[in-house]
From Swiss-Prot:
It comes from Shigella flexneri. Residues 273-286 have a biased composition (Polar residues). Belongs to the SpaN family. Its main location: secreted. GO terms for cellular component: cell outer membrane; extracellular region. Required for surface presentation of invasion plasmid antigens. Could play a role in preserving the translocation competence of the ipa antigens. Required for invasion and for secretion of IpaB and IpaD proteins. InterPro entries: SPAN_dom. This is Surface presentation of antigens protein SpaN. Disulfide bonds join 19-292. It is found in: Secreted; Cell outer membrane. Keywords: Cell outer membrane, Disulfide bond, Membrane, Plasmid, Secreted, Virulence. It is a peripheral membrane protein. Residues 129-151, 267-292 are annotated as: Disordered.
Length: 292
């Protein structure tokens, strides 16, 4: 998704001016402010909707006197801290990272849904001053989006987060080591702004090595390394993910990791072990439990 879909009110000019007066690394502080960010995003279905992190990158160089900031919602694969999240309408996170005498880079990784976050700073030329600290978010992860395949609508519902973890196993197994992440638009999950049900729009997103198409509550993934015309459609039915291959070529790949049902589709749920990838899947689950 394009960054212009998100409007982030990071700081005021007065706050930046105040930060620039800091003289040493010891004065850097992480402030929680009553500052809201507005998320403007299109509608889309449940698939992977609760499975992303927020990465914020900040860089300050005194000779330019500017802050460079960016934010992205990324569906991250097994090797990249895959976590689920719940994005609120507003975030109360603010970083003062300006150092007038030397360059400094900072990276803030907030896994909102699992109540954890990392602030990591790096002051060039002085390794002893590098430090890392944790931050606890007050976001409630219980209000998640649910997809209804029967009428192509979505709404709010409280349910277990465990099923949302499993989609990363599927994508990482299908995708191998080609791309570590891809971006998806994220729906505003503020309950006050969500009607009981909304129609989903068909949308095409191109990111790195994949094309992602979504229609109603089903999403179709086209992996470039498979070649043109090969894809897999993923939907949610009865508490499990249903994967429909476009042809026998894709079906053969799914045979390596999932079992086929009577209708020729492949199902994936938390009770099913991946064929031929048991060790990798187990390693990922342990990592997820550790981080969540």
């Amino acid at each position: 998704m394009a960054l212009d879909n998100i409007n982030l009110n990071f700081s005021s000019d007065k706050q930046i001016e105040k930060c620039e007066k800091l003289s040493s690394i010891d004065n850097i502080d992480s402030l929680v402010l009553k500052k809201k960010r507005k998320v403007e995003i299109p509608e889309y279905s449940l698939i992977a909707s609760n499975y992303f992190t927020i990465d914020k990158h900040f860089e300050h160089k005194h000779d330019k006197g500017e802050i460079y900031s960016g934010i992205k919602n990324a569906f991250e694969l097994r090797n990249e801290r895959a976590t689920y999240s719940d994005i609120p309408e507003s975030m109360a996170i603010k970083e003062n990272i300006l150092i007038p005498d030397q360059d400094i880079k900072a990276r803030e990784k907030i896994n909102i849904g699992d109540m954890r976050g990392i602030f990591s700073y790096n002051k060039s030329g002085n390794a002893d001053k590098n430090f890392e600290r944790s931050h606890t978010s007050s976001v409630n992860p219980d209000n998640l989006l649910e997809s209804d395949n029967r009428n192509g609508q979505i709404g709010l519902k409280n349910h277990s987060l465990s099923i949302d973890k499993n989609i990363a196993d599927i994508i990482s197994l299908l995708n191998g080591s080609v791309a570590k992440s891809f971006e998806l638009p994220v729906m505003n999950k503020n309950t006050a702004d969500i009607t009981p049900s909304m129609s989903l729009q068909e949308k095409s997103i191109v990111e790195n090595d994949k094309n992602v198409f979504q229609k109603n509550s089903e999403m179709t993934y086209h992996f470039k390394q498979w070649g043109a015309g090969h894809s897999v459609s993923i939907s949610v039915e009865s508490g499990s993910f249903v994967l429909k291959p476009s042809d026998q070529f894709v079906g053969n790949k799914l045979d390596l990791i999932l079992k086929q049902d009577a209708e020729g589709n492949y199902r994936f749920d938390s009770s099913q072990h991946n064929k031929g990838n048991k060790n990798n899947s187990t390693g990922y689950n342990e990592q997820s439990e550790e981080e969540c």
